[in-house]
Every structure is written in structure tokens, then in C-alpha cells.
Amino acid sequence: METSSSRSVQVDDWQKNYSVVASSICTPKQKADAYRALLLHIQDAYANSEISQVFATNLFKRYTEKYSAIIDSDNVVTGLNNYAESIFALAGSQQADSDKWQSGLSINNVFKMSTVQEMMQAGQKFKESLLEPADASVVMCKEPTIFEVPQLGVCGGSEEADLLSSSVHGTEKTQAIPGNSLRCSPFQSTLFPMATNTKTCLTSSAPSGESTTATFHRTPLFGNTKKEPQSFPKTSTGLNMFLSNPSCVPSGCENPRERKAFNDSDTINMLSNPTLNKAPSKTEDSGQREDNSLPTFKTAKEQLWADQKKRSHQSQHTSKSFNGAIKKSLGAGRSRGIFGKFVPPVSNKQDGSEQNGNVKPKSSRAGSAEPAHLTDDRLKNVEPRMVELIMNEIMDHGPPVHWEDIAGVEFAKATIKEIVVWPMMRPDIFTGLRGPPKGILLFGPPGTGKTLIGKCIASQSGATFFSISASSLTSKWVGEGEKMVRALFAVARCQQPAVIFIDEIDSLLSQRGDGEHESSRRIKTEFLVQLDGATTSSEDRILVVGATNRPQEIDEAARRRLVKRLYIPLPEASARKQIVVNLMSKEQCCLTDEETELVVQQSDGFSGADMTQLCREASLGPIRSLHTADIATISPDQVRPIAYIDFENAFRTVRPSVSPKDLELYENWNKTFGCGK
């Protein structure tokens, strides 16, 4: 009977996959999955001797070729891209990618490419062929020549400017340029058609008395660009590059129209030959030059250093505007004398704002209510950085918790509603002796919902919830722990009503002894004083809720201040059933009421966390019943629902986390100090 049912399932799967393959509306991914399933069925049938070897070989070859046609196809519509999806998913989730990386490709690099250089040279050859032989009065050479201009006078009328000959790099002969070549020659008139005045000449653009470099870079029409060694002496006047500086217009072009035409022709020539649009760098005494090489690659770390330098320069400029005030600094910049003021290593956000007389900490998740609390008189003696730390890290902004989310512990929930939630919701009714207590202690075995009760108190009463631990209040600096405790209660008074939840309170308020460290003793003393001391007010609506698994280790003074001490026992049968029903309602489960009762009976002594682990282990039963080959091809709908046999297998691996000896200890402590039944 079982064999016939398995064969019918295989036939149904074969027909389903074959219909997917024959369909024209299915995606290549679905077809590839169907082909893989068919190949697996062929292998299983041959392994069970249901088909012959020849028939299995022919079928396997046929479907393998069809499967390969989909996998190896380059067509986007009919093929399956089995690499790009996973690669894009991995590349999209990389955290090390930085938007600070810069590309090494720029416009100057494009002009340095060999193909672009060939195109520019071809254009120059065509431009040269258009010139008449008589107009080619400018000497052209294969290598560029840098001419030194030691003296350049102002030309006017019959005066001419003589240029000294300059040495050419290498073994080439010196070439002299006559004075009239600086005037508007026919070659220059070709480049600048509107500048035809024969009386124009170049003038120095440098003001009198300013020392500049008198070098003239002439870019050739052919050949590579080279420079002469910059070992020439400085002169009193300088000549900027003729084609790259728009201010170097002929002195004779005093007409605005001629000057405009000269600038327009200069721009056109620079666009036609981009290599002429590079101004030479100024020569310094040290002989340093401007680096024209390819831009170097900057990593995210180098870019971060550059940004930090920019911010430091900006902060220096900003600090100078504060009436010459000196900003506090750490490290080598501070005074090391015996009379120097000590600057604490902990960053104080108030230092930068003391000069202006106000405090401006960063905005936190508390929203728009934070500025109103920072101006409160109760926070005037609290450091702003501690207020910011409490608002950002200690204040809890999690989802709300309802009483229905907590299974069992009906007595504890009713007591908490009576003495905590209702007084916080209606403080006008619960006054005087009806006022809420200052502290509540929730003790019991682990995994019974003590933390959920603390969150539910804050959610249902509309109070601000502070979740702290011993690590959030301790510090390696002397006196910082007490300040943090004082700041915590100061912020809580500004955020009334407030609930301060301390998980594992025995680690923070343990019994004080002779061998205890001084810093931990001061933190405990400050906490007890803030909880119920001479400076506290009876009108403060601040509730301290502590949860612990070891109530016998709490200090006597802390136990006295935690007035209501409620025992949170293990969940009863009804509570365990509620946990199982709630968890199984989110999964595919076929448990009957009788089977659920059996699970509840067998889970006697389990905590709430143990019941959750039991259900999680049972939910893995249907997955474990599958074969390894079926996991790769099976769909989620084909996974069978959770059955009672899965819970039976889960009971073999999941054990209760609380021993009867521990339960006896909790019950004895509850009889001695507890406030429950």
C-alpha cells in the first residue's frame, strides 16, 4: 500500500514538472528547476530497477541536453543567468564600499592617450597645409623650446622688443626670434583673424616690483612635450603664456571690439588644440614643480585623513572668531607645566559651547522633547554628554508590549496593575497612602517573563522606559559612575512618569562587604540615595523595577527600598498551553486538542523559554524527515505540517532549565521576603 502511494506521488510530480517544461509561460528558472527534478526522478527510477539502463540513458541524455540549452544560452529571454543574481546580491551588500573613491580618468588623461594625440597631430597637419609658404615665418621644431625673456619693455610706436636666444634642450642649435616676430605676423593673423594691427606687441602682465618667472612655453605642432631644466635666474618682469592667459592681449588692441575678437579667437584656438590650454607652473626657489602625472588613487582611509585636515582648518578659523579665545586641546598641544589646567581625556561637548554661554548637544532619538528637557533647572548640574548618552543608549524605544503577550502569572499581573499602572494613569486619584511604590523586585527562575513584565509596565502606563545594566553605569574614570547614576535619575524626573528597569539587579546592588571595590560601593550608595533618600520627593513618579534570578544576593538596603517583591513562578498548565497554541498558530500544524494536552502534560517543569525552545525544535521535525536530495528541489508547500511525533522527538533533546532544588530556594525566599501568595 505504501509502495503504490509513493508511486502515485512520483507520477504526480513527473506530470507536474513535465507540464512546466512544456508550458510557454513559465520562466527559464522554473523550467531549469523542473528539468533538475525530472533528472532526479530518472535516477531514482533506475536505482529502484523500475526502468532499464538503455531507457534511463536515453531519457537522461535527452533532458540533460534540454537543461544545458537553458543554462548555457546567452539569450536573456530564453536563457538562465545563474551567476549575475547571486553576484549582484553579494556586491550590493558589501559594507566596505566607499563613496570617497575617485576615478583616475580625467580630461587631461584623455588628451594624453595615443589615439587622441594622433587625431590632434592630424588636425595640426591639415591646419599647416592651409598656410601659405610665405606666411610660415614661425620656426617650428620637433622638440618644444622654452625661451627666456630677461627683459621685456613696453612697445609703442617704433620701439621693438628684442628677445634673447635661449638654449634648446639637447644638442640642437640656438634659434633667435627677431623682434618683429612678436608682432601680428601672418601666421598670427591666421590664428587670430581680428588682431591685424601691426603696431601690437606683447606686454608684461606682471605688476612692477613683483618677481615672477620669465619663461615662455611654446607648444609645437609635432612631437612630444618636454621642458627645459628650470635653472634660469629670476628676472624682474615675467611673460605669461600667450595662448592660455586671456589677459595677455596685444597692447595695440585698445578698441573694445578688437579686444573681444582677440579673446574669442583665443578661446577657439584653445578648443581646437587642448594642449595649449595648460598654464606653466611657477618656479620656486626650491625648484619644485607641479606634478602633471596621472592622479593617484585615494583610499577611503586617505580621504578620511584629508577630510579631518579640512575640518581641523575650519575649526581653527572658527575658534579665532570667538574673541581670541583658546580652545582646550589634548596631547602635545596642551600645557605641561605644573600650573597648566588639566583637560580630562573624556570628550566634553560643553567645552565648545561654554564660550557662547549655552549648551547645544547633538540631537537624539528622543525627538523634539529633548531641547525642552535640556533647559530644565534639574539638568543644570548634569553634563550634556551624559544626558545624550542616556537619551540615545539607555532609553528604550522598542515596540509596545501588552498583557496578553505574557502567558500565566495572573497574580503578578493583577498586583502590578493595581499598584503601578493605575496610579501612573490616574495620579489625581492615587495620592497619599494610595501612591505607587518606589521600587518593585521581580524574582524567580530564568525564562518566566520578568523582562516582558517590565516593558509591559512602561507600555501600558505610558511611561518612559529606561533599561540599564551594571555595565552601562560603570566607568574606568573615577567618579564617572556616580555621575551617570545621578544623571539617569535627573533625566527620569524630567521624563515623568518613568520606569527604570534593571535586569540582573543582583550584579548592581549586591551585598556590600569589606573586600568590595571603592568605585562599586560609591555607585551603590548613590543609587540607593537617588532611589529613596533625603533629596527625593514623594511626588516623583519614578518606578524602579528590578529583575533577578538570585534574590538572596541583593543588599539589605536595596531590598528595603524595593517594597513590592513579587515571585514570578514557572508557567502552569494553562500558561504552557497558551504558549504552544500561540506559537503553533504561526506555523503549519496538525495537532489536535488531545495531542496538545499531552504536550502540556509532558512539559511539566518547563519555563516559558523552555517551551519556546521545545516548539522550535519540533518545527524542525518535518525538515529532518526529508532526504538531502529532496531539500534542493522541494517547494515550501510540499513540506508536511508539524505533527505530534515531532514533539515526541523534541522531548528527547529539550530538558527543563530549572531544577527542583532551585524552585525550593525561590519558594523559601518568597515565604520570607516576598509579597505574593
From Swiss-Prot:
Modified-residue entries (N6-acetyllysine), positions: K341
Enzyme class at the top of the EC tree: hydrolase
Glycyl lysine isopeptide (Lys-Gly) (interchain with G-Cter in SUMO2) crosslink site(s): K226
Upregulating conditions: By E2F1 and serum stimulation.
Single GO BP term: ATP metabolic process
Family: Belongs to the AAA ATPase family.
UniProt name for this protein: Fidgetin-like protein 1
Source taxonomy: Eukaryota, Metazoa, Chordata, Craniata, Vertebrata
